[in-house]
Amino acid sequence: MQFAFFAHAIGIILLIFSGNYIGLLVANLLIGLGNGCTEAACNPMIADAYEGNKMSTMLNRFHMWFPGGIAIGSLLSGLMTDSLGILGRDQVWLLLIPTLIYAYLFFGQAWPKAKVQEAATLGGNVKAMLTPLFLFIAVCMSLTAISEFGPNQWVGLILSKSGAHPMIILALTAGLMAVARYFGGDMVAKFDQTGVLLGSAILATLGVYLFSTQTGSMAYVAAILFALGIAYFWPNMIGLVATKVPKSGALGMSIIGAVGMFANSIFQPIIGGWIDSDRAAASANGLTGDELELVSGQATLETMTIFPGILIVLFTILYFWLRNRKTDDLEPTAAH
C-alpha cells in the first residue's frame, strides 16, 4: 500500500503537469500500478480478516467502490465542467484527496496473518495455482474481464449515435454496479458464488445483446441488465479463489486479477479491429455519418456477446464441478 500511495501521488501530479505524450504515458502507468497494488494488497487482507459469507460481503463491498468511484467521479466531472467551467486538467487535482485519505488510513496499521499455513509459502501458492480448478478459474476470469471491460469501453461512444447520452449510461452502469455489490454478500449467501456467477453471465449476455439491437431510451434498459450482470464478476472471482483454492494465498488472488487485466489489454485492440472491419462493411453498403458508426458499432457488440455466452457454459460446468467435489477438499487447513 505504501508503493500504491507513492505511485498514485506521483502519477497524479505528473498527469497534471505533463506537457507531452511520454509524460502522460508514464503518469498513467504509475496510476495503473497504484491501482493494481491497491487491489493486490486489499483482496488478501479482506480474505484473511474475515471468514465465510462475511468475507464475500466485504470483498463485494470493497469492489463496490470501483464502479462507485466512477459514478461519483463522472457526476462531479459533469458538474464542474458544465456548471463551474473547470477544465479537465484542473479536475485531476481532486484525485489527491482520496489518495491522501487512504494513506492516512493504512500507514502504521498491522495486517492480518494468512489463515492457511501453505498460503504463507511461495511453494504452497505455486502448487495450488497449478491445480485444474485454479487454471479453470483463470480461464473464466479472462472471459469475465473481457465481458465487463470490452463493451464498457465502447458502449457510450456507439450508442451516443442513437440519441442515448453516454455520461448517463456510464453513471447508470457504474451506479447500479455499486449498489449491487453492496448487497453481494446476501446474493452469495442465497445462491452461492457459482450460482451468482452463472446468473451474472446470463444477465450480461442479455445486456450486451440488447446493446447491439436497441437504440434511444432502450439503451438505458440494456445498461441496467448489463450492470447487474457484470457487477458480481470481479469480486466473486477473487472470492472464489480465496474460498475454493485457499492455499494459493495472496499470490493466487493477485494472479487471478492480473489474468483479468491482461486478457482485457489483449482483446481491446482486437475489438477495435472488429469495429474497423464492421465499419468498412457498413460503409460498403452506403451508410455514412452517425448511422455508419451506430450500425458498425452494434455489429461489434453483437460479436461480443460470445464472451458472456461462453461463460454461461463454463459457470454451469463449474457449478456441478464444485457441487460434486468433496467438502474436505474445499476447507482450508488451519494455520499453526
Describe each model-derived feature in a short phrase.
Residues 6-19, 203-214:
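C-terminal ends and interior cores of transmembrane alpha-helices
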Residues 16-27, 212-222:
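Helix-loop junctions at membrane interfaces in 12-TM secondary transporters
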Residues 89-108, 298-320:
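Symmetry-related core transmembrane helices of the 12-TM Major Facilitator Superfamily/SLC fold
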Residues 27-64:
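Cytoplasmic helix-loop-helix junction between adjacent transmembrane helices
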Residues 53, 58-114:
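Helix-loop-helix hairpin linking two adjacent transmembrane segments in secondary transporters
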